[in-house]
UniProtKB/Swiss-Prot annotation:
Example GO molecular function: metal ion binding
Name by which UniProt lists this protein: Cytochrome b
GO annotations of cellular component type: mitochondrial inner membrane; respiratory chain complex III
Gene: MT-CYB
Lineage of source species: Eukaryota, Metazoa, Chordata, Craniata, Vertebrata
Extra remark: Heme 1 (or BL or b562) is low-potential and absorbs at about 562 nm, and heme 2 (or BH or b566) is high-potential and absorbs at about 566 nm.
Cystine crosslinks: none
Subcellular localization: Mitochondrion inner membrane
Sites where the protein binds heme b b562: H83, H182
Annotated organism of origin: Phoca vitulina (Harbor seal)
Cofactor remark from the record: Binds 2 heme b groups non-covalently.
Length: 379
């Protein structure tokens, strides 16, 4: 009798995706982040669902409803902090996942890569709208500043901003629609993730060497299910430590002050995972230029496959490109630090230099390094 998992229409899909999936035998721990992102997404949807049961999307009660969740709801505090810090873990895994793709040349699977970029934008939009919901000072002013950037679009900018706001300022209408979008977008992310996997399984996974591995593949289960469980346990450990010992470590103290349109916080800044893009935005004095740089800082990933000049796929055997990659990582950490600093003398210049370097590495230096490496190897 044939095994039900190989014949049943639904079980067959699960079997081909997670059990009998042929997987390269040499993929490292850097390939764990896909499954970790899936775990993060499930965690965020579940904790978000329970938070939505108690949250009210009205400007007069939003802040106090979050306080009520933390103080009066059974284990409400842990659900709230799992959700808030779960978002941080989500972005750590996302950036590691994208970094792995850049390092090992996974971007040559263009469909998978492009859907990944759409996923990144969608998750960023979801996180931004979620940050507005507690209706603290940073929620309100963050929403005001970021949505206001759209007014830089010629002709339609101002109308577009007022259309998003649902009025002439960030108010009740804005909060209600942000809550609605924040609720629905994770399900859009889930659907996109399924398409992302669909395209990935058309080609099969890449591996650290970047060489075709069809001749040497092993079933996903039990080898990689065990490996993924280890990664998941480590993720849960870090998240648990964060939630139970320092839940506000990555948050902003200003968000414990109820939103007040009449009082501007001294330093308006988004959550830590957007600081690199915020630093790029701030480093350009022109408003439209800043907005374009902000969008391009992520959209540049879509151009990376077109700029691949190396004869090798990954960077495993390319020392010059490796150096540039780690320069890029250091540059992004510098931008993250700058994004959290006030707009004054040394920080402005450092931010501008780091922003120029970011685009230079991806657009100019990496393609040149690849050509040099090809010539060194006489390819």
């Amino acid at each position: 009798m044939t095994n039900i998992r190989k014949t049943h229409p639904l079980m067959k899909i699960i079997d081909n995706s997670f059990i009998d999936l042929p997987t390269p035998s040499n993929i490292s721990a850097w390939w764990n982040f896909g499954s970790l992102l899936g775990i993060c997404l499930i965690l965020q949807i579940l904790t978000g669902l329970f938070l939505a049961m108690h949250y009210t999307s009205d400007t007069t009660t939003a802040f106090s409803s979050v306080t009520h969740i933390c103080r009066d709801v059974n284990y409400g505090w842990i659900i709230r902090y799992l959700h808030a810090n779960g978002a941080s873990m989500f972005f750590i895994c996302l950036y590691m996942h994208v970094g792995r793709g850049l390092y090992y040349g996974s971007y040559t699977f263009t469909e998978t890569w492009n859907i990944g970029i759409i996923l990144l934008f969608t998750v960023m939009a979801t996180a931004f709208m979620g940050y507005v919901l507690p209706w603290g000072q940073m929620s309100f002013w963050g929403a005001t500043v970021i949505t206001n950037l759209l007014s830089a679009i010629p002709y339609v900018g101002t109308d577009l901003v007022q259309w998003i706001w649902g009025g002439f300022s960030v108010d009740k209408a804005t909060l209600t629609r942000f809550f609605a979008f924040h609720f629905i977008l994770p399900f859009v992310v889930s659907a996109l993730a399924a398409v992302h996997l669909l395209f990935l399984h058309e080609t099969g996974s890449n591996n650290p060497s970047g060489i075709m591995s069809n001749s040497d593949k092993i079933p996903f289960h039990p080898y990689y299910t065990i490996k993924d469980i280890l990664g998941a346990l480590l993720l849960i450990l870090v998240l648990t430590l964060l939630v139970l010992f320092s839940p506000d470590l990555l948050g902003d103290p200003d968000n414990y002050i109820p939103a007040n349109p009449l009082s501007t916080p001294p330093h308006i800044k988004p959550e830590w995972y957007f600081l690199f893009a915020y630093a790029i935005l701030r480093s350009i004095p022109n408003k439209l230029g800043g907005v374009l740089a902000l969008v391009l800082s992520i959209l540049i990933l879509a151009i990376v496959p077109l700029l691949h000049t190396s004869k090798q796929r990954g960077m495993m055997f390319r020392p010059i490109s490796q150096c540039l990659f780690w320069f890029l990582v250091a540059d992004l950490l510098t931008l993250t630090w700058i994004g959290g600093q006030p707009v004054e003398h040394p920080y402005i210049t450092i931010g501008q230099l780091a922003s120029i370097l970011y685009f230079m590495i991806l657009l100019v230096l990496m393609p040149i390094a690849s050509i040099i490496e090809n010539n060194i190897l006489k390819w």
